[in-house]
A protein has these predicted regions:
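Conserved ABC transporter NBD signature motif
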Residues: 59-74
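Conserved ABC ATPase "signature" region
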Residues: 96, 100, 108-125
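Conserved ABC ATPase signature
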Residues: 129-133
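ABC transporter nucleotide-binding domain
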Residues: 173-245
């Protein structure tokens, strides 16, 4: 399978702090690639490089066969973990404005936005001010704005934060549909259940070092024997056992 993103021997240092140390990964085209790791592992630095907010000290990033450059910015949609909308603007007005910043004409933006608003059953929010919406409602708007210019690469950083289970399932369905329609997706999270459900391939990173990388299926096969049994002794001397992976 052709790789859409190739990160080759990338390192980044801030002062004496090594944020990334000789990282190499390959993200197959039209796949969902999971970035896993604790806070401070290096996931955000990697995402910032893909968005060209910062540059590697060494190594290179290949974007769809070309060395990453400014022309690729319009082909990326990024939903950061820290989100924010202009509170006093109307929802529809702001969504059109943000779509135009991504190169979509006003007429086309309104057409695409109305499609997504109907799909998410939120068309009634169009003329409301952002400050009238709950956090979860605002995050739906930001998800829509992230995908509105139909980018080739989507980067989602903890996209389910703040959502109830119903809306989490709604977004999971949309993410899978976006992949099936041709998008390549990088999904940064701490949630292993979501990784198993959504991701084709993953990388586990910690302290700027790659710990493991591969397909979710292969990693599960490689580590399937890593289990243990917990024996719980109750006061009535009955014994219960629980199998853990």
């Amino acid at each position: 399978m052709q790789n859409f993103i190739e990160i080759n021997n990338v390192s980044k240092t801030y002062g004496t702090y090594k944020a990334l140390n000789d990282i190499s990964i390959k993200v197959p085209k039209q796949s969902i690639y999971g970035l896993l790791g604790p806070n401070g592992a290096g996931k955000t630095t990697l995402i910032r490089m893909l968005n060209q907010i910062t540059a590697p000290d060494q190594g290179e990033i290949i974007f769809n066969g070309e060395k990453l450059n400014r022309n690729h910015i319009s082909q990326i949609g990024y939903l950061p973990e820290e989100r924010g909308l202009y509170k006093t603007m109307k929802v529809g007005e702001q969504a059109i404005y943000l779509a135009q910043l991504k190169g979509v004409s006003q007429k086309e933006a309104e057409k695409r936005l109305k499609y997504w608003f109907k799909k998410f059953d939120i068309l009634s929010w169009w003329d409301k001010k952002v400050e009238e919406l709950s956090k979860g409602m605002q995050q739906k708007i930001q998800f829509i704005v992230t995908v509105i210019h139909e980018p080739q690469l989507l980067i989602f950083d903890e996209p389910f934060s703040g959502f109830d289970p119903i809306n989490v399932n709604l977004l999971k369905k949309e993410i899978l549909e976006l992949r099936d329609k041709g998008a390549t997706i990088i999904f940064s999270t701490h949630n292993m259940a979501s990784v198993e459900e959504l991701c084709d391939n993953i990388m586990l990173i910690n302290k700027g070092q790659k710990i493991l990388e591969g397909s979710v299926y292969q990693i599960k096969q490689d580590f399937k024997d890593h289990s243990f049994e917990i024996v719980l002794r109750q006061q009535d001397n009955k014994t219960t056992r629980q199998q853990e992976d």
